[in-house]
């Protein structure tokens, strides 16, 4: 059974540049069949995560223009990450504590992958999955 984030993550993750538009991000999400993209700066460092929900709620529903709004303008605050060699238990604690559905995986200060709920469901114990679901979505 897998024991580290590196073992269950989806690798080869593509970033959206912080200066690229939200429209570009939406097209890339559709092309890749994903619901979120890491936002990377010109220095290749992780700046945030952009989700399809961010695009709908923070741009479209707010009357913004997806063709002019940059991905970087939506990736605010501190990015929650996990180390590639951190345990699945630590990964579950981090997802629960920060109520996140996707967790970027960092190795030597570089993005190497992302762990999603589906990665977790495929590789974690049922107890670990329940812990994350309760942390992210509540006990109700």
PLM feature segments, named:
Residues 1-28, 34, 39-42, 46-47, ...:
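Bateman/CBS regulatory modules and CBS-like beta-alpha motifs in cytosolic regions of diverse proteins
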Residues 59-60, 124:
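Flexible, gly/ser-rich surface segments that form the specificity/activation loops bordering the active-site cleft
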Residues 118, 122-125:
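C-terminal structural segments of small proteins and small subunits
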Residues 54, 73, 119:
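Ca2+-coordinating acidic residues in Ca2+-binding motifs
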Residues 24, 54-55:
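Non-catalytic alpha-helical scaffold/packing segments enriched in small hydrophobic residues
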């Amino acid at each position: 059974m897998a024991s580290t984030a590196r073992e269950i993550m989806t690798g080869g993750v593509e970033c959206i540049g912080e200066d690229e538009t939200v429209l570009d991000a939406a097209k890339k999400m559709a092309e890749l069949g994903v619901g979120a993209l890491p936002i990377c700066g010109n220095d290749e460092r992780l700046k945030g995560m952009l989700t399809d929900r961010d695009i709908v709620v923070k741009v479209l529903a707010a009357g913004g223009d997806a063709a002019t709004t940059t991905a970087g303008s939506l990736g605010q605050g501190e990015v929650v990450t996990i180390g590639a060699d951190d345990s699945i238990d630590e990964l579950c604690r981090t997802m629960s504590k920060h109520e996140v559905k996707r967790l970027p995986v960092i190795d030597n200060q570089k993005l190497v992958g992302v762990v999603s709920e589906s990665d977790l469901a495929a590789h974690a114990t049922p107890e670990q999955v329940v812990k994350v679901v309760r942390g992210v979505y509540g006990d109700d």
